[in-house]
């Protein structure tokens, strides 16, 4: 298992796996359905851990980490199928959020603030 992979590395790894099959990537609508399915599985797991609904005794053991991994895999597939570089998409989103929301929330005090 590789540690500290870049998103580019992850996208290439997923593409290497998917490209060995004739079927290739699912269509965008099918991937959106898969993404929704994985969100539901994540929600179910979060509900078991933090909500009032315990797992049934016969229910398989799972973790939030596993569900996030499944969700991330589908996201990488979606990006690859659409020729979207996830790193670039993330940078664009963070630039937008850092600009738009820089004064939206109450900032934590820095140590420098205590010396004024």
Give the ranges of each region predicted by the language model.
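Flexible "arm" and connector segments at domain edges
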Residues: 1-68, 72-116
């Amino acid at each position: 298992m590789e540690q500290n992979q870049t998103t580019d590395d992850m996208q290439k790894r997923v593409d290497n796996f998917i490209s060995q099959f004739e079927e290739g990537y699912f269509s965008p609508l099918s991937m959106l359905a898969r993404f929704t399915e994985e969100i539901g599985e994540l929600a179910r797991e979060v509900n078991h851990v933090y909500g009032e609904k315990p797992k049934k005794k016969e229910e398989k053991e799972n973790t939030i980490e596993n569900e996030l991994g499944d969700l991330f895999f589908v996201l990488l597939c979606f990006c690859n199928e659409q020729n979207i570089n996830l790193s670039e998409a993330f940078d664009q989103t963070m630039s937008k959020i850092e600009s738009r929301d820089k004064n939206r929330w109450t900032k934590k005090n820095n140590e420098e603030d205590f010396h004024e």
